[in-house]
């Protein structure tokens, strides 16, 4: 490294540049390779994961749009360079970063695509600096968004074809503001109808609507519960939704809400929109309470008042209340169990070097070895395909070399990636086949139209309803989706493993 005098770096806790959301060793590696003359060497990395969260049969890939915007705006500031000099990076490297723009290629699954273990979700091909330095942000973005979108499909009932109305209420329990915002976005894609987070709607628009009514503190502030109800109805006569369990649901909350609704009917007899829209319960036996509330409200002709429930709910509690207890709940507010994916809080996506472009334009495969077959990397510049059967459902995914092609009607001879498969050699009829790893950025330029949030939400719903086998959607012991390698990929993997490890993949 160049021996120069560096002034101490002055911290600034308000400073923010996403390009610096990077593990320090990324800079250490990139600086070293730069100093050894590899700045123009093109590397290929794949981002994939090894296990579905919550032992599911699938996951939802999410975060691609945020990643695209990050790469298109990738840059370093003088403050960044001063810090990197302070941390020991070379002056030449920092000067190179001063004008650096990301000019690589990004191939990825479309945001919202159902995905499976080992199949590449993202493929990066870029010069050394642009391939290495983006790893941390890429993984943070893709892992968290995919985790929450997947969890939301369970909580919203999309995955079991039993959709329920769910609002994302987890902002205050999220691990920081960015998790609250990104989590709200991913939850909406996964089937939620709204979020408690105002900034999320400001950032992403009306398809991520902020919703909510009152807290217990609002009710407690007034001399009586009825005073609180009346004040709220006076302020928002077309959006009256009230919390019933501040004092006593059935001795206080219910009688008062019935009385208030009668007052609204008397005051606005010709405006049916000015009525109590819903009531929420946040404690006690929610299933039993909802049934009792429904019966009482229906008995006085108020079947239009919806019942909302919240209180540390998740997909299992909701399903049990619906299936075994006959709960009469119209909508749910779900907080920490969704925004943290509490039952499985880590999406294990990894970012691995799989090829380096040589001077003659060909690609040299790269592979990390492991005694565990599940961690033996699939080397080479790869492409991902999905084969659909005659019913339009995903039959298997194929991992091929980038220059291999498949078309409808092909008979593909493949190698089953599952090490426990009885017969590793399979023959697949490609009734319909789609290339699922598609270009998003080429040579630093956006080459794909990014759909809006509603379109992505509908895309996820359509896949889970029509393009995924029900056996893969089972909550317990789901069918394992078939992932196959082309013989060329399998041979490359075997040859690399034998060369580096001295034996066959076991």
Question: Where does each model-flagged region fall?
Answer:
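Buried, small/hydrophobic-residue-enriched core segments of structured protein domains
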Residues: 2-41, 51-53, 88, 92-106, ...
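Gly/Ser/Thr/Ala-enriched C-terminal appendages of enzymes
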Residues: 2-41, 45, 50, 54-59, ...
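N-terminal, Lys/Arg-enriched amphipathic/low-complexity engagement segments
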Residues: 36-99
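Short amphipathic alpha-helical segments
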Residues: 63-66, 147, 452, 456
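Short coil/turn segments at secondary-structure boundaries
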Residues: 82-83, 150-154, 170, 472-478
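Short active-site oxyanion
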Residues: 277, 305-306
